[in-house]
Amino acid sequence: ITGTYKGKRITVQSTGIGCDNIDIVVNELDALKNIDFKTRTEKPEHTTLTLVRIGTCGGLQLNCPAGTFVASQKSIGFDGLINFYARRNEICDLDTEKEFKRQVKWNDQIGNPYCVDNNPELLDRIAADDMVRGITIACGGFYGPQGRELRAPLADPELNTKIEAFE
């Protein structure tokens, strides 16, 4: 849905759950603005899109009880999505990745987590003062990746406890 809010043109788009769906939306919105579909080439002038994801999340740390509004300063991805794109190490916060893996004693069988920073100017524009700012985690699934166990055992049953203690 596209309309105006306080004189600014905005589009609201549902992406579904997960990084894989967001990957589709981001790439296709970028293509609509920056690719000439007749010639199948990039347009000479690029349009930068400002995207804000609004959604739900669970909370593992005590300062984020249920119902708390959270604004991500950084996001750690367990899904591996960014690893499929070039320049990964230029985009990611490698120091936070390394420290996270060290503190939680990361199990390399799970994959390689990545950490990206939010745009601080955008964060300051949209995040209210009563929002908790911090690191959020994006998982590639709902059950095992988020520490939920039904019948299939978890590779690291203590991962959520270790994440809770991450500083």
Residue ranges of model-derived segments:
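Metabolite-binding pocket within alpha/beta catalytic cores that recognizes anionic/polar moieties
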Residues: 1-114
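Active-site rim beta-loop-alpha module in soluble metabolic enzymes
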Residues: 95-167
